[in-house]
Amino acid sequence: MATGENRTVPDNLKKQLAVSVRNIQWSYGIFWSVSASQPGVLEWGDGYYNGDIKTRKTIQAAEVKIDQLGLERSEQLRELYESLSLAESSASGSSQVTRRASAAALSPEDLTDTEWYYLVCMSFVFNIGEGIPGGALSNGEPIWLCNAETADSKVFTRSLLAKSASLQTVVCFPFLGGVLEIGTTEHIKEDMNVIQSVKTLFLEAPPYTTISTRSDYQEIFDPLSDDKYTPVFITEAFPTTSTSGFEQEPEDHDSFINDGGASQVQSWQFVGEEISNCIHQSLNSSDCVSQTFVGTTGRLACDPRKSRIQRLGQIQEQSNHVNMDDDVHYQGVISTIFKTTHQLILGPQFQNFDKRSSFTRWKRSSSVKTLGEKSQKMIKKILFEVPLMNKKEELLPDTPEETGNHALSEKKRREKLNERFMTLRSIIPSISKIDKVSILDDTIEYLQDLQKRVQELESCRESADTETRITMMKRKKPDDEEERASANCMNSKRKGSDVNVGEDEPADIGYAGLTDNLRISSLGNEVVIELRCAWREGILLEIMDVISDLNLDSHSVQSSTGDGLLCLTVNCKHKGTKIATTGMIQEALQRVAWIC
């Protein structure tokens, strides 16, 4: 983040960003400028936040415009970042620093996830050619990333932060000597009209002038600000031998014929290892490459047809050469915010350079040991060891004490098993041997024999019941015929007597004391009652009440009336503990059926 005297961005850049971001309704806008203190490095220039807000703290009047609120929120986020940085950098406690750190309008708990992303981005720096901003400046073309939260960290170094902030679309394009980055939480397909709209809004504002205190700082050419590319002429070539002992990399050179016919050597490598990396400290400023820009007469159009796939491949290849893992930087920033470390720099490569030189120290990429292998080994170790943690007790060898306990419990179990077998042997009469297999075999055979006996008894009982019912039916038919004949005779006699006898004389029914018209058969709990008597009104209900009073539960009732007789058959069962005898049932029914 550019601070102090090395600030290379104008004061009105935030307002230009605010107008552009609000117009396209994206979440934020960041301008990455080339560092004045570390050439070849992109750092935070300025930014504008336009996303969701969790807590708003302001001491201004309520009628402040929304535009001013957005600028105020962006400024509060910048002050919060500076206060957190100052609080860590001055642990000894300068009173001025402490007062400034405590004056921040926001605190970390007031921020949303998107604001956290915007805040942490202030601590990022990029080598030219590294990450999305560095790749956009290196290739001179915009980079549109639609899957920011799931992108590879080698391509998008802030993918972890983007995932936490639900950020989906990030766009970077070179502009005004730096890189302009815009992002949103919505998924937006690639549309160059968005980039053109942002550029147009910037051009409508006052002209952009770069303010820098370094006299030896050269302006970086923006290839998208003009219709054609302007080649960079190398007026002083590298020495054929390097005092640092590093191998000299070959370069591609083309010849260019000027209007005056002069031939010069030009290089189309806008960004390469010569810019993003460093030459050894022994080289002074006179050994460095001096670059100049030509005018309109010296322009030559380069081939603009570059594949986006190749560009992303170059970004990934360059990101593989980074000396530090992205997660280390993320952890460093978070630990700084929570006051557990004093580091806010991306890595040691930005601390080991010569402050008197304009270049950082160059390191061969092959000698850099990346942390990717270590991370892969750690992931594999976790995947293999975590599932085995639940089976730790099974894998650990038993101690002598545990072995003794197991043996004792096994001995007790065997003793109980032997006792059960001996009990079983005493119950089964046909067991002749005492071994366990013989006991089990004899037990199985004995149980099968018992099952056969039960089946035989059940079949015998069913046959006996069937025979009893058949016998009762046979006895029932002749009795019915005799009783009907006698009843007919009695009726004829009764009719004859009715003619001779006066109406005031009672008729003789002739059924009192007859026991042949009542039969009671009992088999176990089942009782069958067969009754024939003279019919009168309500006699059936009286008979059923008597049966119920004798603790008999009626299951089926068959009744018929004819010629003044009631024929009744009741199948019932005894209920309860008090069982009525056949004599009691017969006496009770006779009192009801043959009332004179």
Curated annotation (Swiss-Prot):
Principal subcellular localisation of the protein: nucleus
Transmembrane segments: none
Ranges where the bHLH domain occurs: 401-450
GO molecular function ontology, one term from the record: DNA binding
Expressing tissues: Ubiquitous with higher levels in buds and flowers. Specifically localized in developing root hair cells. Expressed in epidermal root hair cells (trichoblasts) and moves to root hairless cells (atrichoblasts) by a cell-to-cell movement through plasmodesmata (at protein level).
A biological process term (GO) from this entry: trichome differentiation
Regulation: induction: By UV treatment. Negatively regulated by MYB66/WER, GL3 and BHLH2 in the developing non-hair cells, and positively regulated by CPC and TRY in the developing hair cells.
Gene3D superfamilies registered for this protein in UniProt: Helix-loop-helix DNA-binding domain (4.10.280.10)
Keywords: Activator, Developmental protein, DNA-binding, Nucleus, Transcription, Transcription regulation
Biological role stated in the UniProt entry: Transcription activator, when associated with MYB75/PAP1, MYB90/PAP2 or TT2. Involved in epidermal cell fate specification. Negatively regulates stomata formation but promotes trichome formation. Together with MYB66/WER, promotes the formation of non-hair cells in root epidermis cells in the N position. Whereas together with CPC, promotes the formation of hair cells in root epidermis cells in the H position by inhibiting non-hair cell formation. Also seems to play a role in the activation of anthocyanin biosynthesis, probably together with MYB75/PAP1. Involved in seed mucilage production.
UniProt cross-references to PANTHER family, sorted A to Z: TRANSCRIPTION FACTOR EGL1 (PTHR46266:SF3), TRANSCRIPTION FACTOR TT8 (PTHR46266)
Quaternary structure and interacting proteins, as annotated: Efficient DNA binding requires dimerization with another bHLH protein. Homodimer and heterodimer with GL3. Interacts with CPC, MYB0/GL1, MYB5, MYB23, MYB113, MYB114, MYB75/PAP1, MYB90/PAP2, TT2, TRY, TTG1 and MYB66/WER.
Name of the protein this chain belongs to: Transcription factor EGL1
Lineage start: Eukaryota, Viridiplantae, Streptophyta, Embryophyta, Tracheophyta
Gene from which the chain derives: BHLH2
